[in-house]
């Protein structure tokens, strides 16, 4: 009888702890920590909202047929980019997104992410290849403000002697 109670208690703990666990690691795609509910990005006069479910899955209508590995990292999806379908793949290392590859009928866009010690993206190295011709450029970030969770809320991006400001507001699941 004691064994049955013990097994039932373990089963209940397993079920309830699984409910609270974050199953998906899609927050890595947006370089945020914590249980994020949504992010509102602003650059110049344009803004974009990215939503997440309570289990950590990104909620975007332009992400189609996502594939996940056993750790909850999105590894592949189809994406609607400027009205054209493309294939996206993602590579991770040490719990960070390190490479994103977008393939379309005309070419490939590869982004490699280089991180600061605090986990923020220092540089994004972009290589775009169309019809066999390649062009590379680097976006470098300088972070200005962070929220209580340690996620950046304001940064300056530099590329080829041009700068622009990014800001974001992040709401978290409780």
Regions found by a protein language model. Name each.
Residues 1-24:
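Bacterial Sec-dependent N-terminal signal peptides
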Residues 22-174:
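Buried hydrophobic residues that stabilize the cores of well-folded domains
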